[in-house]
Amino acid sequence: MNENSVITKTRRRKLCMAASDPEKPLAVITHVAFGSGGVNVSGEPIVPTETQTALNSELARYEVESVTYPDETTARYTVTIPKDSLVGKEINEAALVDSEGDLVAIKNMYSKKKDEGVSFTFEFDDEF
């Protein structure tokens, strides 16, 4: 992971419990959340923290469409923001969300403005 992304402490706690207690299986990734609070006033991505439990300014969540495995320790989640959603919004933060609604990884990036009539397809890699 780069400096603008983080695996949350919530995810690391859940991994620890799942590895040591069969009564606590790991919740699967079901959604990707998008937001507009991932940059500073100069437009540079800010570093997310492992203790974050929410995006700084969440705009929407979308269900994961597919998962691929580009290598044996990476799960790549694909999600599409539809043409009619988030028109005119600047997207600069994203998070993987598990089936319990917890943010498990956060990535901040440069702003991408969503145009009318255009769908955005995002890929988010979960690297182990």
Regions found by a protein language model. Give the residues of each.
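Small cysteine-rich, disulfide-bonded extracellular modules of the LU/uPAR three-finger superfamily
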Residues: 1-91, 99-128
